[in-house]
């Protein structure tokens, strides 16, 4: 039977947090951010396995968190690579061979909802690839090289992409392997498919599905958690 697998990418160093501790290990309400993220997927009935990708020297720390909080479904903890795309590729190679849909998610997004996860799987089964996100609340400007505003896109045409980003496993693996062969750089996994002419369906995420990357995000995260509990 085919599986739905999730790759949690926890290999970032969190330089923007101005902390010696990687952002995924910082705490909200006395529990590490990574705990909340892992829990969302481990308790979701449609998720069959979790592959956690982290810094090589943090593998033991991640194992301790998993054991301490009795988080299940984590099949492997694997070391990350030099860039995020390398870490994702390591995760792709580690998922079960019978994986059909793979979700790729930032460890520092602890407030992903059950509906976002479920819809990602559903739309991927329908379209082959799907990513959640939100329409920007602010007006967006395009500026010239000299710093002047030259255009104002319609907000309805813009989309702030979040994670999970969800894919047919064979499609995303094939595109990642081509990416390595051609030595191309990308900033997220939807770009991996876009590089090879593949379409990604964009569906509604949630404004609370934030990525915690700055001290201000940590404060906002505490407020979001207060509302959820």
Swiss-Prot record:
GO terms for molecular function: 2-C-methyl-D-erythritol 4-phosphate cytidylyltransferase activity. It comes from the Bacteria. It holds the Pfam family IspD. Its EC number is 2.7.7.60. The record marks 16, 23 as: Transition state stabilizer. Gene3D superfamilies: Spore Coat Polysaccharide Biosynthesis Protein SpsA, Chain A. InterPro entries: IspD, IspD/TarI, IspD/TarI_cytidylyltransf_bact, ISPD_synthase_CS, Nucleotide-diphossugar_trans. GO terms for biological process: isopentenyl diphosphate biosynthetic process, methylerythritol 4-phosphate pathway. Pathway: Isoprenoid biosynthesis; isopentenyl diphosphate biosynthesis via DXP pathway; isopentenyl diphosphate from 1-deoxy-D-xylulose 5-phosphate: step 2/6. The record marks 155, 211 as: Positions MEP for the nucleophilic attack. It catalyses: 2-C-methyl-D-erythritol 4-phosphate + CTP + H(+) = 4-CDP-2-C-methyl-D-erythritol + diphosphate. Keywords: Isoprene biosynthesis, Nucleotidyltransferase, Transferase. Catalyzes the formation of 4-diphosphocytidyl-2-C-methyl-D-erythritol from CTP and 2-C-methyl-D-erythritol 4-phosphate (MEP). Belongs to the IspD/TarI cytidylyltransferase family. IspD subfamily. NCBIfam families: ispD (TIGR00453), PRK00155.1-3 (NF001183). This is 2-C-methyl-D-erythritol 4-phosphate cytidylyltransferase. The gene is ispD.
